[in-house]
Curated annotation (Swiss-Prot):
One of its GO terms (molecular function) is protein serine kinase activity. It catalyses: L-seryl-[protein] + ATP = O-phospho-L-seryl-[protein] + ADP + H(+); L-threonyl-[protein] + ATP = O-phospho-L-threonyl-[protein] + ADP + H(+). Residues 314-682 are cytoplasmic. This is Putative L-type lectin-domain containing receptor kinase I.1. Residues 27-264 are annotated as: Legume-lectin like. It is an enzyme of class 2 (transferase). It comes from Arabidopsis thaliana. The active site is at residue 472. The gene is LECRK11. ATP binds at residues 354-362, 376.
Amino acid sequence: MAQRLHLLLLLFLICFVNLISFSSQQDLSFIYNGFNQDQTNLNLDGSAKFLQDGLLQLTNATTQQKGHAFFNRPFEFGSASSQSPSFSTHFVCALVPKPGVDGGHGIAFVLSSSMDLTQADPTQYLGLFNISTNGSPSSHLLAIELDTVQSAEFDDRDKNHVGIDENSLQSVESASASYYSDKEGKNKSLKLLSGDPIQVWIDYEDTLLNVTLAPLKTQKPSKPLLSITINLTAIFPDRKAFIGFSAATGSLISYQYILGWSFSRNRALLQSLDISKLPTVPRPKKPEKTSPLLIVLLIILAIIVMVVVGGFYLYRRKKYAEVREPWEKPYGPLRYSYKSLYKATRGFNKDGRLGRGGFGEVYKGTLPILGDIAVKRLSHDAEQGMKQFVAEVVTMGSLQHKNLVPLLGYCRRKGELLLVSKYMEGGSVDQYLFHGDKPPLSWSQRVSILRDIASALCYLHTGASQVVLHRDIKASNVMLNGNLQGFLGDFGMARFDDHGSNLSATAAVGTIGYMALELTSTGTSTRTDVYAFGAFMLEVTCGRRPFDPAMPVEKRHLVKWVCECWREGSLVNAVDTRLRGKFVPGEVEMVLKLGLLCTSIIPEARPNMEQVVQYINRHQRLPEFSPNTPGIGVSTPVLMGLPSLAITSSSVTSSVSGPSASPSSANNSMFISHTIIYGDGR
């Protein structure tokens, strides 16, 4: 009897404890209509703080900051045998930019296994992860982000989006910020970084997660912005998580606030926020108004400047009118009027500037019949050699190959030459390799581009009526169309850049890292182009410039470093890390070895472009050679500055006779000069 009594008592205690536990889980419900009362249950860190008017400020106008605010009791899901977890939350936030600057980075509602996110980074990591924890299942974190900066590394769709992040900032679901208007029956865009309060509802039930947005005084829309199935218990095996907010700034800053917050395990029991009780969002002060007297003085000064500039413009227009000479009559169909090019480029507006290089600036334009074009403006003060140069430009325009950028014509003014070519909407290869505004190229795209340029260069060497040496093959001179097909461009500038003088075949011309050793002694030939193409192959495969003075000494010369990787039996380690291992190892090894063969310092050891085309298309196998073969993997002395050159860069200057060099703003490589030569250069 006593034993049975003990068992009943034990069973009662177990049921009582479970009931208390279940009750505590059911009781996790709260509401904050502003945060000026009962702040004890909220844990803040970083830049987060409560303001006197009841606002919860997560970040201020300081760079590289992060702020967190968590409810100090965990949201517990219960045992594995209990019902599936569910919750609903409603909060109002505001992201306020500083006047005159772009704001960032964003704010997120967070479920985390820990309130301690102090090891997370600000900027694009939003105070949620760092480089080592991002993407790790051990992070145990689910976030709904309101992101105002587009980060290419996380495949963000734009700089005004909402995303659902599961242990990673690469969202499993995202959409541009908007809300469904039940009145109009369609989605309406919503600017996150407007400074206006935004309502956010997050509902989770039966593994379905819904995220809904709306302006402040709008009822909850009937359709969510995001809806996705999420297994919350898989993210949080311990079946509990802390709930709260995270926000961050980087070099872009903004004030990020939470005005009110309501949470409940049961959507039906979720208390609605009282909009009338929410604090007002402060607006940063705008600069004080300029005094009327100063405005009048500025207007008078502007009028004077306009008169002076207008007079100077008329003077310049008369003095530098378009130049036409009798010998240009045969080229009439290829001659464009300056007025048409001026209108096509909207007056060479800086907004249409595509780039700036060692020879001049390139602008995008539109002609009625041809459509989009690229116009390159070149300054030139000498008339000597102009006739021969224009003749060469026209001849270059007659070259026909599918992978050459078509040269359409020219325009000539006193002191200026304008070259018109087809516009390539894909930009240049170096923009994909070295600039964050373009997505990384896949391996198949890179190989296809290399094959395109090899075909074009083979045509210049063997397919034209005369041998054409490009002499400046590099990533910034390889253009792409909308389908990412490669086109070799930016040729025909040599004689003009040398101020009309007759070019010597022994002149050392090109860009640092692409120049063959023999340029300063025996001069140019098709094999010097082969060397530059080999450097370009390595550049595209490795995602590194052929010569980078900022790298450690052992990695400064790409040719030497790739050969060293081969010597150590790890050739594929030289591949661009942005490929993330998605490449064909055998094909990569073939391309890298071919690049090393083309950059041999022994000209006779290099293949010609016909052979290169056969090798890169896998029609022939590469000849047998090793990293210890003479001439392979040797960095050329011209990169260090030979006595016959005068190379000027931000770090090296040599005041000796020879062609001068200047840094190219197009690709930050040291450019010496650039030519095309017709004749027997095979």
